[in-house]
């Protein structure tokens, strides 16, 4: 699959301290790639000065588009919002905060091209990945990976990395059906993709440097329980009421 343009969505929540540096670094990386591109930042709630700082950055980065809304809805909502506005031949998203090194985007796009893939997902378990994150995160990732394999039978090793790329039609077909707004939306994305027949999903190496102290108003265990509940809800919609067949 030859493609000429890329849209990259960046969901941002209370990132006023780092967002300008993050977007400048991301733009520097994308400017080296042989594609036309746009960077779509979705500010998930006007809770600090993130939106204002991005507005000030627009005159300096012509490829930057900024959207936002008053109330915080969750990462899944923000990603969906941006993905459905994107128009690139390939549409992807990457987490703000730059725990993930954007230099690996080029590798993901090469894999998309070489494999004529529907979806490329970053994976901590790819043999060429370089990851730095604590043992307790590894244990939780293993447990959640085992659960999702039992429930959904995904033929991928890691579903949760915040860097994924889709062919335009795949992105619009999948994200128009997404319901989950917060923590388990990655699982719902892959579930919907499989259900729609998009099975050409490949994993790509990443460089991950986990930064302690992610900004959220919820406790760690509240997040874990919310993810489990949302994951069960996806299973219910898939297997019981066949919501995604519509």
Task: Label each residue range with its predicted role.
Residues 17-21, 48-57:
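Acidic helix N-cap motif at the loop->helix transition within catalytic regions
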Residues 35-46, 67-69:
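Short beta-strand/loop segment that forms part of the nucleotide-sugar
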Residues 67-85, 90, 102-183, 210-228:
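Acceptor/aglycone-binding surface of glycosyltransferases and processive sugar-polymer synthases
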Residues 4-10, 19, 26, 37-42:
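Hydrophobic targeting segments
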Residues 1-5, 17, 25, 153, ...:
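Hydrophobic helical membrane-anchoring modules
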Residues 13:
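A short, exposed helix-loop element centered on a Lys and neighboring polar residues
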Residues 43-52, 98:
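A conserved acidic beta->alpha catalytic loop
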């Amino acid at each position: 699959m030859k493609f000429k343009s890329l849209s990259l969505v960046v969901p941002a929540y209370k990132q006023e301290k780092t967002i300008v540096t993050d977007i400048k670094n991301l733009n520097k990386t994308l400017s080296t790639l042989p594609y036309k591109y746009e960077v779509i930042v979705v500010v998930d709630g006007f809770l600090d000065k993130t939106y204002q700082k991005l507005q000030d950055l627009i005159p300096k980065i012509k490829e930057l588009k900024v959207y936002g809304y008053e109330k915080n809805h969750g990462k899944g909502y923000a990603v969906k919002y941006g993905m459905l506005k994107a128009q690139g031949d390939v549409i992807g998203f990457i987490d703000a905060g730059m725990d993930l090194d954007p230099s690996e985007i080029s590798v993901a796009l090469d894999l998309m091209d070489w494999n004529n893939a529907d979806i490329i997902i970053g994976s901590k378990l790819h043999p060429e990945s370089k990851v730095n994150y604590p043992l307790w995160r590894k244990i939780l990732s293993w447990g959640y990976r085992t659960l999702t394999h039992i429930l959904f039978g995904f033929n991928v090793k890691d579903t949760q990395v915040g860097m994924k790329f889709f062919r335009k039609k795949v992105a619009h077909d999948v994200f128009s059906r997404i319901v989950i707004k917060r923590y388990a939306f990655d699982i719902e994305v892959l579930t919907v993709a499989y259900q729609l027949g998009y099975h050409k999903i490949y994993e790509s190496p990443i460089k991950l440097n986990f930064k302690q102290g992610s900004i959220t108003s919820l406790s760690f265990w509240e997040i874990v329980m919310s993810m489990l509940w949302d994951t069960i809800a996806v299973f219910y919609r898939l297997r019981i009421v066949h919501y995604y067949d519509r």
